Amino acid sequence: MVLSADDKTNIKNCWGKIGGHGGEYGEEALQRMFAAFPTTKTYFSHIDVSPGSAQVKAHGKKVADALAKAADHVEDLPGALSTLSDLHAHKLRVDPVNFKFLSHCLLVTLACHHPGDFTPAMHASLDKFLASVSTVLTSKYR
C-alpha cells in the first residue's frame, strides 16, 4: 500500500503524540483484541492474558516499540521489520488475520485516547500504515 506524503506526516504526528504512552496503548489494544476476538488468545497460551497482567503489558510495549520503529522507518518498512516478519512467519506462525484484528483494536485505542486528533484523514493514514505493517509482517509466509 502506498503511503502519501500526507499519510507519512499524519503517522509521524500521531506517534509524536503517543510519546511515553506506547506501552500502555499497546497493552490496551491487546486486551481489546482478546475481548473482541477471543480466538487470538490461543497464540498467547503460554502467558497470563488477564487484564493488568505484567506479561500482556510487556508484550504491549513490544508491539508499541515495533510500531514506533516502523513509523520512524516508514520509507523502508520491509527493512525495519524484517526480523519481526521472520519471527511471526517461521517461529510463531501467527495467522495473518490476527494482524487485522490487532490493527483494528489499535485504531480504536488511539481514537479513544486522542479523539480531537483522530480526524478522518488521520484514521485513513493510520489504517493504511497498519495495513502496510501487516503486509510486511506476513510477506514471508509464502
Curated annotation (Swiss-Prot):
O2 binds at H59. The modification Phosphoserine is found at S4, S50, S103, S125, S132, S139. GO terms for biological process: carbon dioxide transport; cellular oxidant detoxification; erythrocyte development; hydrogen peroxide catabolic process; in utero embryonic development; negative regulation of blood pressure; nitric oxide transport; oxygen transport. Pfam families: Globin (PF00042). Red blood cells. Transmembrane segments: none annotated. Heme b binds at H88. InterPro entries: Globin, Globin-like_sf, Globin/Proto, Hemoglobin_a-typ, Hemoglobin_oxygen_transport, Hemoglobin_pi. The modification N6-acetyllysine is found at K17. Residues 2-142 form the Globin domain. The modification Phosphotyrosine is found at Y25. One of its GO terms (molecular function) is heme binding. The modification N6-succinyllysine is found at K8, K12, K17, K41. The modification Phosphothreonine is found at T9, T109, T135, T138. One of its GO terms (cellular component) is hemoglobin complex. Keywords: Acetylation, Heme, Iron, Metal-binding, Oxygen transport, Phosphoprotein, Transport. Belongs to the globin family. In rats there are two non-allelic alpha chains and two non-allelic beta chains. The alpha-1 chain sequence is shown. Heterotetramer of two alpha chains and two beta chains. This is Hemoglobin subunit alpha-1/2. It comes from Rattus norvegicus.
